[in-house]
């Protein structure tokens, strides 16, 4: 149960959270280019009493609290990148009830809540039960390929006993399994030519279209408890209206929360690529993203972590938690056998659209929920 001191702190810090969101939203942070937002976060942490803060090679801002050379660790993270490629500040506005901006919920508001909640424990020099890493991590979105989370697990994996990531739009949500994915950039090349003079030559757009049509004939594997999907998200190609296309490409993916189903999809896609190569068409299939499913996590420890999150949701919100699979920064620790969950510290909608928004009235509950999860790792 949160103490009166914690509750008062959250009430007093609500405007701090809002101001952090405003300032972070003004700093563009596309995946792989989070430098400016990382520098801002590092400066904020240092100005607010964090003594051991560094930006690693993956552009993670890592705040180490009471970390020794060999003690066990817990990780709390929220990502700095947004799904949008913009390198100039994006439109931001607010009214009495909401803030509106691309990326404002995913994951800026979650990050702001993490930062302010972490400040409570650090400024009061609370004794931790283990080492704590507060991380503003990079590259969660899209082709960021979970680079930031991978680096944390690479650097600290054997010492991490539990792992939390704050992401999402519903405070009741507890992500309890990892959705893995493979993402390809597929390029088809043919001889092409002039649309009149070389009529009859092979057209790369035609063969790519045919390949896409073949993909969409697949029936995904059916397995109890598993969900498997596929998608072609981007197609490009051609030169002009009077040119037989020499080159066309697509970005495609498949996903599943089951490792066997994911491998079934890999086999199917690879067979498609080989089929078109056998037609004499050049097919280049580049794996541009790979997110793993859950690995062999000790079930008893994982169940205990989920139970604590469920208890916090019931205590703070008076609501039942919503369990489900998702693709988040938690994929990486789960694949490594580390108990991990993803919860939300914000309520919003329109994620991954230019109309994204958050509910301001939900921020205090998001902070209370996040602080309740952190509280278990500190002495009373």
List where the protein language model places each region.
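A non-catalytic alpha/beta surface segment that caps or lines the substrate-entry region
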Residues: 20-23, 29-71, 91-93
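Short beta-strand segments
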Residues: 77-78, 135-137, 163-167, 187-189, ...
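Metal-dependent amide/peptide-bond hydrolase catalytic core
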Residues: 1-5, 185, 189, 193-380
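Active-site metal-coordination/substrate-binding segment of hydrolases
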Residues: 70-136, 156, 365
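N-terminal capping segment at the start of a domain
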Residues: 1-35, 348-352
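Buried hydrophobic packing segments
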Residues: 41, 111-121, 152, 208-211, ...
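Acidic-glycine-rich active-site phosphate/pyrophosphate-binding loop
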Residues: 80-95, 160, 177-187, 341-342, ...
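Acidic/histidine-rich catalytic neighborhood of metal-dependent amide-processing enzymes
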Residues: 107-179, 253, 378
């Amino acid at each position: 149960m949160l103490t009166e001191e914690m509750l008062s702190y959250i009430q007093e810090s609500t405007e701090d959270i809002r101001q952090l969101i405003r300032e972070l939203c003004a700093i563009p942070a596309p995946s792989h280019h989070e430098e400016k937002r990382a520098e801002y976060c590092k400066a904020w942490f240092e100005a607010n009493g964090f003594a051991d803060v560094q930006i690693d090679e993956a552009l993670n801002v890592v705040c180490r609290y009471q970390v020794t050379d060999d003690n066990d660790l817990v990780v709390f993270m929220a990502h700095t990148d947004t799904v949008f490629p913009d390198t100039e500040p994006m439109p931001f506005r607010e009214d009495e009830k909401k803030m509106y901006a691309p990326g404002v919920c995913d994951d800026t508001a979650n990050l702001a809540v993490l930062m302010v909640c972490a400040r409570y424990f650090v400024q009061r020099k609370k004794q931790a039960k283990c080492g704590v890493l507060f991380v503003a991590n990079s590259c969660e979105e899209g082709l960021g390929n979970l680079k930031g989370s991978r680096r944390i697990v690479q650097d600290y994996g054997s010492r991490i006993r539990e792992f939390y990531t704050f992401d999402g739009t519903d405070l009741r949500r507890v992500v309890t399994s990892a959705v893995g994915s493979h993402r390809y950039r597929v390029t088809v090349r043919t001889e092409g030519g002039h649309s009149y003079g070389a009529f009859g030559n092979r057209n790369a757009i035609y063969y790519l279209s045919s390949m896409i049509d073949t993909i969409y004939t697949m029936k995904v594997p059916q397995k109890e408890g598993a969900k498997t999907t596929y998608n072609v998200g981007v197609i490009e190609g051609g030169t002009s209206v009077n040119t037989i296309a020499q080159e066309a490409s697509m970005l495609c993916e498949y996903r599943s929360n089951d490792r066997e189903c994911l491998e079934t999809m890999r086999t199917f896609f690879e067979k498609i690529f080989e089929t078109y190569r056998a037609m004499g068409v050049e097919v280049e299939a580049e794996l541009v993203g790979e997110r793993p499913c859950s690995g062999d996590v000790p079930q008893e420890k994982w169940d205990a972590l989920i139970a604590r999150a469920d208890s916090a949701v019931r205590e703070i919100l008076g609501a039942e938690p919503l369990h489900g699979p998702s693709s988040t920064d938690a994929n990486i620790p789960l694949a490594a056998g580390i108990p991990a969950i993803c919860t939300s510290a914000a309520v919003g909608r329109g994620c991954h659209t230019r109309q994204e928004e958050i509910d301001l009235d939900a921020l205090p509950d998001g902070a209370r929920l996040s602080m309740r999860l952190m509280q278990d790792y500190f002495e009373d």
